[in-house]
């Protein structure tokens, strides 16, 4: 009986901490929007006037990126770095995760189940944690190998959208990944398509992982009072591969002149695509992983 009680307590404790990608922290962040200098006075020209970019242009780029992924992206690996502000306004630490992902566009018929493997690298409190989820695996449950001498003795199975798994998270594991990021951006952008208070800039020459990318900045001049409201959003696009590599959004400063507070940041570094991931990459029995054998 004592053994069962101890195991039960361990599972509850593990569940509470398992999906907390970001550890609560009262420390601030030095993150700030990229300062981009844009000329307001274009030189005189006999040619046609160049229209400033707008949300429609951003939506077109995002739609093109989604189409490119549907055609060319079967799977990928990356060093995923995320940072989020929780529901009470506390900005968590940056969390670094090694990610392996299979998109829904793989296979001969361009249709495959979505699968994800995560291994946490930092912060130290979660280093070594592993998570596997697949829409066709384990009855939709999330397999978790927690860190620690006691908590790491047993694989924990969680509902990905349940209260324990969502503790401290903005999105469930099923919403992680390049494809979902683009789809979410399109969904948000459509809400601002006809918003006159939104200003857009698109700048070449932004370096991300030693790759020349485009930096898109979307600025709101007044709050929208929507659930996903922001003052500034930044999107980094790799134009060669038509992939969105990074997204950050900032809230509204408390007073004029203050830096806007970071709300969320997601970046995919060292991205490798179409490397041939198999079902073994999303199997708790994979000997390269640390999942317990029971």
Language model regions located:
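Gly/Pro-enriched, hydrophobic low-complexity segments
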Residues: 2-6, 19-30, 119-124, 132, ...
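Sequence-pattern detector for short linear motifs
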Residues: 6-7, 23, 42, 57
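Core hydrophobic alpha-helical transmembrane segments of single-pass membrane proteins
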Residues: 7-16
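Ser/Thr/Pro/Gly-rich low-complexity linker/stalk segments immediately outside membranes or between
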Residues: 23-51
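Hydrophobic transmembrane signal anchors and adjacent membrane-proximal interface regions, especially
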Residues: 24, 36, 50-55, 71, ...
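Intrinsic-disorder-associated interaction segments
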Residues: 48-58, 171, 175
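Short secondary-structure boundary micro-motifs
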Residues: 51-52, 62-63, 83-84, 115, ...
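N-terminal mature ectodomain segment of secretory-pathway/periplasmic proteins
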Residues: 56-151
